[in-house]
A protein has these predicted regions:
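Short, tryptophan-glycine- and acidic/Ser/Thr-enriched carbohydrate-recognition patches
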Residues: 34-50
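Aromatic-lined ligand-binding clefts that engage carbohydrates, nucleic acids, or primary amines
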Residues: 32, 55, 85, 91-112
Length: 139
């Protein structure tokens, strides 16, 4: 099965086939596609079939203003980030965990479905919408 993961800044998904170990399907430093929007992006940007070939590419973690970012971005309100991964046998997965480090808010999607959010209000956030609070990345 092919999956699409979309969210802000440094993200890793962890899966485990048996309780005795975890496997990461998205690794730190993996290449992602990203968009620094000047207007609202296409409404299907978070769908698997969306063609993001015109977006920029960079390795995770994304950010600005400190020395821990692999892909340095200009100061911006929002960034849209996409990555794909493949799971060959979904039947062996008992759970998936989203682990991310972010400033200041995020909305995460998996195959077009929202799976997590923090400090971002509204059903579909606007590209120029600031977060609802402050959260400093820990890494």
């Amino acid at each position: 099965m092919r999956y699409l993961s979309l969210f802000s800044f440094f993200v890793s998904f962890l899966t485990y086939a048996q309780i005795d170990h975890w496997e990461s399907v998205v690794l730190p430093g993996d290449q992602w596609q990203y968009l620094l929007p000047s207007s609202q992006p296409n409404s299907n940007w978070n769908q698997v079939e969306f063609n993001s070939s015109s977006w920029d590419s960079g390795n995770s973690g994304f950010g600005y203003g400190d020395a821990d970012d692999t892909t340095v971005l200009p100061s911006t309100i929002s960034v849209y980030i996409r990555s794909t991964f493949t799971i060959t046998d979904a039947s062996v997965i008992e759970a998936m965990v989203l682990d991310l480090d972010y400033d200041d808010g995020f909305v995460a999607y998996l195959n077009g479905q929202e799976i997590a959010r923090n400090l971002v209000s509204g059903s579909v956030p606007n590209f120029d919408q600031a977060s609802d609070g402050n959260h400093e990345a820990m890494l």
